[in-house]
Design a protein with these regions (language model features):
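Active-site gating loop/helix substructures
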Residues: 115-168
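Contiguous domain-boundary segments centered on the initiation and propagation of an alpha-helix
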Residues: 89-91, 101-109, 148, 159, ...
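Patatin-like phospholipase
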Residues: 1-3, 8-104, 136-144, 153
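Generic secondary-structure signature for well-ordered alpha-helical cores
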Residues: 23, 67, 109-112, 160
Length: 168
């Protein structure tokens, strides 16, 4: 199982490490795992792995559009700033998301979870309603997946964007 966590722009580090591993393997990273899971930025990375989108593409997205995707906000430095940042995390999504949506649409198009090449699990939380949902590919016969869900919509639900709350 490859499990990838969130962390906003800090996900660039994980993306770089995964891209280097993928490059050294000489094949898509997803072929080495039975299940791929991720939340928030880890969800984006997990989708890339599950769909065999080269991780170098995600690294480029972070490097070229990271400031727009993450609102150009730096890391919280002081105690008060960290508390305000935590409050924003609890009361709603931190980021607007239109730039990210446009970029994801460009790479994933109208692909659905059924199009994933590898088993995938994306837990999502609607923080405004305290509702959780686990989106998944139909990788277990007894468990219905969310195969009709568009990838772009799932990544938006995954803790990032206001408009997607209704999907949870």
């Amino acid at each position: 199982i490859l499990a990838l966590s969130g962390g906003g722009y800090l996900g660039l580090y994980t993306a770089i490490v995964l891209a280097q591993i993928e490059q050294r393997l000489g094949e898509p990273l997803g072929r080495r795992f039975d299940l791929i899971a991720g939340t928030s930025v880890g969800g984006i990375l997990a989708m890339a792995v599950a769909f065999e989108l080269p991780l170098s593409v995600i690294v480029d997205l972070f490097k070229n559009r990271g400031e727009q995707v993450f609102s150009g906000r730096g890391l919280p430095s002081g105690t008060v700033t960290r508390l305000l940042d935590l409050t924003r995390s609890v009361t709603g999504p931190k980021y607007d998301g239109q730039v990210l949506r446009d970029e994801l649409q460009r790479h994933f198009g109208d692909a659905t979870l059924a199009d994933a090449r590898h088993a995938l699990v994306i837990p999502a939380v609607d923080v405004t309603r305290s509702v959780t949902k686990v989106f998944k590919t139909p990788h277990v016969q007894t468990s219905r997946g969310d195969e009709d869900q568009r990838v772009v919509d799932q990544l938006r639900v995954d803790g990032w964007h206001r408009e997607a709350e209704r999907a949870v």
